[in-house]
Amino acid sequence: MTSPSTRPTLTPALLVLLALLSAFTPLSIDMYLPALPVIAVDLHGTAGDIQLTLSAFMIAFGVGQIFYGPAGDRFGRRPVILIGLAIYVVTSIGCAFALEAGHLIGLRLLQGLAACGGVVLARTMVRDLAEKDQAARAMSLMMACTSIAPMLAPLIGGQILWFLGWRAIFWVLALIGFVALALAYVRLPETLRPEYRQPLVLSAILRRFGELFRHRAFMGYAFTSSFMFAALLSFLSGSPFVFIERYGIAPRAYGLVFGGMVVFMTVGSLLNAKFAPVFGAGKILRYAVWVPAITGPIAMVLGWIEARYGTIGIWPFFLCFGPQIATISLIGPNSMAMALQRYPHMAGTASSLMGVMQFGLGAAFGAVVGQTFDGTIAPMTTAMGIAGALCLVSHRVLVRRG
């Protein structure tokens, strides 16, 4: 058994490294968002086809966590993360050589499977080294660091697109993956306690998942964070086409618009890191779920009005999107911390199940937005409004009564 004196601690340097591993989601998604319309033309695909490259990544990212979580509980966090990063580098290079929309969809599927290992096990490593409110604080700080990625990724992607073309974006992702792999190999410790190692046996894995499914409060936290994530994925799927094609924003400038939204998310992360240890993750979560339940439906109604009567401008929507996206930083880390506190002996499995639900629902909402896109903002705002309302319902029905 590892003694307390020899166990790794959650140092600022380790937290930054874990934030880098968590950043592969926004990097893999947000950096190529400005290029979606260009990719559609270059690969002779429709808007719906190219938006499937986003949904394919998210579906694979979610499903892959079913395997990474239990594998991390059996073999340890470090080796599983290293293998995932190595595969990510290879698949990113493959995306750069895609010749058809179908090829890119398939490669993004594999890229999503590779990327999810670091993300799900980075959360698990925080849980290995911190408890409840401190874990919520650490996850918020990690999310604040990670939020730099979605703030800069569209800006960088837009510039790469302008000067080098969209394929260079995936070469840059491959380079980032290689740097992360090298850093993880040199600096990432193993945090799984020997006594918490779980057998990688199908019956045992199913038994652990069954235990989680039967816990009403756990499922409540999982659905609460998942519907919040679905609102974000609806925004990510629809905003490039809405802002660039409908509102005439240049692809290079799209990153500025998206970065403005991420500022709200960063502020939310910093506030949560400051106040979670003071008020508790559960109390903050109880109030935070009301924000998307109010702003989401308002944006939905505004979207219907614009679709029927003509454009009303983008600013009324920004006033709704900003607060809704900011609360992702409050709802996500606090839901995760509250859900994982009861399961230190299978934190990887619990984290993976929440990840599957988050990215599964997110991919479903994003795919619907892509397939129903009609040139207006209404499909995107409708999805965000429904997800925001269901976020509140999940918390009130499952968590409060669980």
Identify the function of each model-found stretch.
Residues 2-7, 189-221:
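Juxtamembrane intracellular "pre-TM" segments in multi-pass secondary transporters
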Residues 63-102:
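Conserved MFS/SLC helix-loop-helix module at the cytosolic interface between two early adjacent transmembrane helices
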Residues 86-99, 292-309:
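C-terminal ends and interior cores of transmembrane alpha-helices
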Residues 87-94, 102-110, 315-320:
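Paired small-residue
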Residues 99, 103, 141-186:
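Helix-loop-helix hairpin linking two adjacent transmembrane segments in secondary transporters
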